[in-house]
């Protein structure tokens, strides 16, 4: 799920997947593996488990909000929403995620200079106020500003947590540590929209934001009384130096071109928080799926009344990742990075094409799951590919700025998706055209990366 966090941890996780997916050939090896896993678990300090809990709570509340935000913005007041236009909603969706991808670069330098706990205090204060005022506000300007404040908090939170994970693990247990970190993110993204969001929005959508604000307050207390800052190397790096490094990376046009081409896939991904949710609300009759799920649930409870709603799109995405990420990573672990990225983009694009086939709930499920398989295939390889093409003395710098795919994909995805939906769905009534146009972006990204691989990478090598 995950948007920024996925990028930060997929590289360590790809190493971890090899550890977790080993199948013992003998009982002795199995016993040794179990013993090693137990000792590795015990090797983590208290600070590690503290930030795992913090990450689970923060990402859970964030994805709980994002799972319904796109719909909350456009619902009428009578339906419990704010009544904004889809273009206005697209502007918000095209602004908030880019901040989450961009701010950690500056926040990391600030945290290294002034201290993790101080930055966390600032981050949680921003989240408390941002989520809280979003739930209280009705005007477009106040909602926009409140969500920007929330994004600032989330953007400053992220590098501190990943930095703490890195400093509270060692060479022997870092793979497992970042693997646990990754699962905590997706577990939060799975459970909060599945359990809390339906209960809260039945009362009021505002309660979802109050929940997120309350959790941010709990995180603030954890930071004050439980979290212990790990030993870190203090730095005097200024923000001017940070931006100077960014300019250095931006001069590598091949690197920037590759990121721009890869960003096409993320234009599709960020439709999961906008156009896909609107499509579920406006076009899909989920009754067959509801009946099937309730028929299964009736084996355990009397008269179940489960109902699929927009927040369950996030649940599907996170759930598929939880179930299949290790399997997918094990399958592609020896495959070359760039061709695997292209294959993953192809799978994601196929998911969008499937959405154009019909408004059947089963077709929709297959499309979203196929897209998620593409996401799981392409993104870990993207991180490893950055490590391959970066100059030997600048690998950390290049990996730090590989976030640009999220800035480009989310900003274009938010604004473009809203405009396309209004034209082809609201005005023309042809949602299939919307999905095919978006699929065209995925095809362009895949073909362009193929040409990049053939004509630029080989010449460079």
Where are these regions (language model features)?
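Glycine-rich segments within core transmembrane alpha-helices of 12-TM secondary carriers
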Residues: 175-200, 215-219, 402-414
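A membrane-interface helix-boundary motif in multi-pass transporters
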Residues: 198-214, 419-443
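C-terminal ends and interior cores of transmembrane alpha-helices
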Residues: 125-139, 346-359
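Central cavity-lining transmembrane alpha-helices of secondary-active solute carriers
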Residues: 91-109, 315-327
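Short amphipathic helix-loop junctions that connect adjacent transmembrane helices
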Residues: 67-88, 274-308
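Intracellular loop-helix junctions on the cytosolic face of multi-pass helical membrane proteins
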Residues: 1-6, 10-46, 170-175, 196-273, ...
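Intracellular juxtamembrane helix-capping segments at the cytosolic ends
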Residues: 156-170, 377-391
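Conserved MFS/SLC helix-loop-helix module at the cytosolic interface between two early adjacent transmembrane helices
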Residues: 102-138
């Amino acid at each position: 799920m995950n948007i920024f966090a996925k990028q930060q941890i997929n590289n360590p996780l790809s190493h971890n997947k090899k550890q977790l997916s080993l199948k013992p050939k003998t009982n002795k090896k199995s016993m040794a593996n179990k013993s090693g896993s137990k000792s590795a678990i015990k090797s983590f300090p208290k600070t590690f488990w503290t930030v795992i809990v913090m990450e689970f709570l923060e990402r859970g509340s964030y994805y709980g909000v994002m799972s319904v935000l796109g719909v909350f913005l456009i619902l009428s007041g009578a339906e419990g929403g704010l009544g904004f236009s889809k273009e206005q909603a697209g502007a918000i969706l095209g602004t908030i995620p880019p901040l989450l991808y961009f701010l950690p670069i500056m926040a990391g330098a600030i945290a290294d200079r002034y201290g993790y706990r101080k930055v966390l205090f600032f981050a949680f204060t921003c989240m408390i106020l941002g989520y809280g005022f979003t739930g209280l506000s009705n005007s477009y300007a106040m909602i926009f500003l409140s969500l920007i404040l929330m994004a600032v908090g989330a953007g400053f939170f992220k590098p501190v947590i990943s930095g703490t994970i890195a400093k509270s693990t060692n060479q022997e247990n870092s793979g497992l540590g970042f693997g646990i970190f990754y699962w905590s993110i997706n577990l939060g993204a799975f459970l909060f929209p599945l359990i809390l969001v339906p209960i809260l929005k039945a009362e009021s959508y505002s309660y979802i934001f109050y929940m997120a604000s309350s959790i941010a307050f709990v995180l603030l207390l954890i930071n004050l009384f439980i979290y212990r800052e790990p030993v870190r190397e203090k730095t005097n790096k200024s923000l001017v130096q940070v931006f100077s490094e960014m300019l250095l990376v931006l001069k590598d046009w091949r690197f920037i071109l590759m990121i721009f081409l890869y960003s096409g896939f993320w234009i599709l991904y960020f439709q999961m928080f906008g156009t896909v949710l609107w499509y579920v609300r406006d076009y899909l009759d989920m009754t067959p799926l509801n009946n099937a799920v309730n028929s299964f649930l009736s084996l355990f409870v009397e008269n179940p009344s489960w109902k699929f709603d927009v927040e369950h799109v996030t649940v599907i995405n996170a759930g598929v990742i939880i179930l299949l990420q290790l399997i997918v990573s094990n399958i592609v672990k020896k495959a070359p990075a760039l061709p695997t990225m292209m294959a993953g983009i192809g799978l994601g694009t196929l998911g969008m094409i499937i959405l154009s086939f019909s408004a059947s709930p089963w077709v929709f499920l297959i499309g979203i799951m196929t897209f998620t398989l593409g996401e799981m295939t392409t993104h870990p390889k993207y991180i490893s590919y950055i490590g391959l093409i970066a100059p030997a003395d600048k690998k950390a710098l290049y990996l730090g700025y590989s976030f640009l795919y999220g800035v480009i994909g989310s900003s274009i995805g938010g604004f473009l998706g809203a405009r396309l939906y209004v034209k082809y769905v609201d005005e023309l009534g042809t949602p299939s055209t919307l999905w095919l146009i978006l699929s065209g972006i995925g095809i362009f990204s895949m073909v362009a990366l193929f040409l990049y691989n053939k004509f630029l990478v080989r010449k460079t090598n």
